[in-house]
């Protein structure tokens, strides 16, 4: 089996899982690129990225440029390593053409959509939000564009009706190593394929997008909630307060149930009418509170006054 010298670039959990799996292969990880350490939490403690934690555990050189313009010496450090290939997944820093030109086989990006669909920052969320039944993993030869490079390998992944962005993220984290290792094994003979079809773009998520529109269908709302779980969380406004939603189910609606109205509130759930069904929320999170089952909320809060209230 072919043994390649690899520089790895990534930052969050999904990248860390791929890196862990790559360490279990025959390939040699020469260095790891990841974003600079950040101060996080109330105590503003410095935290390493998940990728840096994995690299340190495996005694690998870690490079953390703020950017390649501000830290151009990092490019020279990578050149000196003479990597066969650079593997990139969710690195989060723009790389210049001279970075792409360093390795013998170029730079491979692991992108979690079936390109050219959902190019950009939030392919997992946008695929669920759109109601797609399938998505996938593309191993792409990086070029100067935004996810525009030729495709070297793909793996289709089904989107279940219960999938959230978190569950789909976790699937991708486990599955990404398979098409990557296949690509590395066949890198001398694989024929890059130009992307086919009309591109769509997965624009960055904003917190405000979590707001639920109950005039839509229950299916659309289900996709919306699952797309924005766990972040930024789907929510509705109740008398000026933001209420985040948790677990839910879809029920049949009566002809006299008004769209956007709160139909009923019992220990079983908080029922809101959409344009075709009822969504029963089994969990809600009121401001400055934890996410709780409706039965637990009712133990300390009177919600009956909201029956008949129209959302939005």
From Swiss-Prot:
Alphabetical list of InterPro entries matching this protein: Fmt, Formyl_trans_C, Formyl_trans_C_sf, Formyl_transf_N, Formyl_transf_N_sf, Formyl_transferase-like_C_sf, GART_AS, Met-tRNA-FMT_C
Keyword Lipid metabolism: no
Catalyzed reaction equations: L-methionyl-tRNA(fMet) + (6R)-10-formyltetrahydrofolate = N-formyl-L-methionyl-tRNA(fMet) + (6S)-5,6,7,8-tetrahydrofolate + H(+)
UniProt keyword list: Protein biosynthesis, Transferase
EC class (word): transferase
GO molecular function, one term: methionyl-tRNA formyltransferase activity
Top-level lineage group: Bacteria
Coiled coil (UniProt feature): none
Any single Pfam family the record assigns to this protein: Formyl_trans_C
Binding site for (6S)-5,6,7,8-tetrahydrofolate: 113-116
GO cellular component term of the entry, any: cytosol
EC number: 2.1.2.9
Entry keyword Manganese: no
Annotated family: Belongs to the Fmt family.
Known function: Attaches a formyl group to the free amino group of methionyl-tRNA(fMet). The formyl group appears to play a dual role in the initiator identity of N-formylmethionyl-tRNA by promoting its recognition by IF2 and preventing the misappropriation of this tRNA by the elongation apparatus.
Protein name: Methionyl-tRNA formyltransferase
Gene source species: Francisella philomiragia subsp. philomiragia (strain ATCC 25017 / CCUG 19701 / FSC 153 / O#319-036)
């Amino acid at each position: 089996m072919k043994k390649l010298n690899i520089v790895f670039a990534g930052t969050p959990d999904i990248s860390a899982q791929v890196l862990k799996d790559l360490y279990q292969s025959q390939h040699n990880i020469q260095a790891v690129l990841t974003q600079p350490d950040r101060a996080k939490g109330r105590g503003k403690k410095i935290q390493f990225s998940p990728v840096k934690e994995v690299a340190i555990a495996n005694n690998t050189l870690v490079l953390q440029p703020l950017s390649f313009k501000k830290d151009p010496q990092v490019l020279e450090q990578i050149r000196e390593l003479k990597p066969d290939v650079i593997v990139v997944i969710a690195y989060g820093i723009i790389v210049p053409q001279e970075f792409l030109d360093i390795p013998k086989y170029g730079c491979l990006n692991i992108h979690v959509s079936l390109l050219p669909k959902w190019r950009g920052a939030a392919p997992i969320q946008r695929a669920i939000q759109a109601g797609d039944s399938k998505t996938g993993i593309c191993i792409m030869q990086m070029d100067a564009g935004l996810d525009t490079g030729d495709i070297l390998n793909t793996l289709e992944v089904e989107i279940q009706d219960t999938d959230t962005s978190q569950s789909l993220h976790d699937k991708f984290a486990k599955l990404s190593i398979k098409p990557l290792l296949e690509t590395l094994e066949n890198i001398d003979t694989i024929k890059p394929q130009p992307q086919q079809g009309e591109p769509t773009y997965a624009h960055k998520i904003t917190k405000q997008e979590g707001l639920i529109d109950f005039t839509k269908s229950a299916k659309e709302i289900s996709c919306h909630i699952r797309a924005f779980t766990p972040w930024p969380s789907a929510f509705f406004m109740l008398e000026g307060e933001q209420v985040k939603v948790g677990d839910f189910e879809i029920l049949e609606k009566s002809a006299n149930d008004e769209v956007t109205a709160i139909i009923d509130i019992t220990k079983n759930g908080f029922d809101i009418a959409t344009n075709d069904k009822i969504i029963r929320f089994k969990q809600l999170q009121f401001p400055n509170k934890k996410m709780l089952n409706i039965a637990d909320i009712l133990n300390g809060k009177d919600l009956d006054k909201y029956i008949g209230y129209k959302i939005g």
